[in-house]
Design a protein with these regions (language model features):
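Conserved alpha/beta enzyme-core scaffold
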Residues: 1-224
């Protein structure tokens, strides 16, 4: 066959050898603490989460524990919703790790906040659509979006439709992935590339974290 020039106008190009011939760099890091550190976690920022695992979610608690372990305080929690499973957050509120919240708050965390007034600013309660609009408009800016996915590949293509912890589509996080400074995918099922039914695209993702289980898919307190 004919030799193809790979250098043109002082630029070097890689010849096309087929759709799956070139290796892709993995974005998998050791754990959520490593991902947060590399993403530039610092005091005063806004980490965001979705609530699709509802009262079975493990990702929010795991991530905020990592925030605490890194010695970071004064964060604004920008989740779509909290449930009884997030009761451990009460201690982080008391310790000043979480000082502001924007999003729906249910169950024991809501009871604690409404009766004890422990935050330095009033909670801003947002409907799911209202939160989407706030992120899109810039009124609420997620510095680091932490997105639970039931399956993802090493490049960050992710879905909630496959895997042992499948919970349905990742309905409330695409807007976070589009606008956040850094995006972390947290999954308990790493798939081959490309992840089927991807809802979050690899070009938006900075880090991928694999944990043993992202949550329990249960129905109680499962209001969307």
């Amino acid at each position: 066959g004919k030799e193809i020039e790979t250098t043109l106008n002082n630029q070097t190009f890689t010849p096309f050898k087929g759709g799956k011939k070139h290796a892709r760099d993995s974005k998998i890091v050791k754990d959520i603490e490593t991902a947060l550190r590399q993403a530039g976690l610092k005091s005063g920022i806004n980490p965001s989460f979705h609530h699709q695992l509802r009262n079975g979610d493990y990702v929010v608690n795991n991530a905020i524990e990592a925030v605490n372990n890194l010695g970071v305080k004064d964060i604004r929690l920008a989740q779509t919703a909290l449930f009884n499973v997030h009761e451990p957050l009460i201690d982080y509120i008391k310790d000043g790790v979480i000082t502001r919240i924007e999003g729906s708050v249910n169950g024991v965390v809501g009871d604690f906040i409404s009766t004890q007034n422990p935050l330095k600013a009033p909670v801003i309660l947002r409907s799911h659509g209202g939160r989407w609009a706030a992120v899109k408009s810039g009124e609420l800016h997620p510095d680091i979006a932490i997105i639970a996915a039931s399956s993802a590949d090493a490049r960050g293509n992710a879905t909630g439709l496959l895997g042992k912890s499948a919970f349905g589509n990742i309905a409330y996080s695409p807007v976070d992935a589009w606008h956040a400074d850094k995006v972390i995918i947290v999954t308990d099922n790493i798939t081959s590339y490309p992840c089927p039914f991807r809802e979050i695209y690899e070009g938006l993702v900075d880090y991928v974290v694999e944990m043993d289980q992202i949550g329990r898919v249960i129905g109680k307190m499962a209001a969307r």
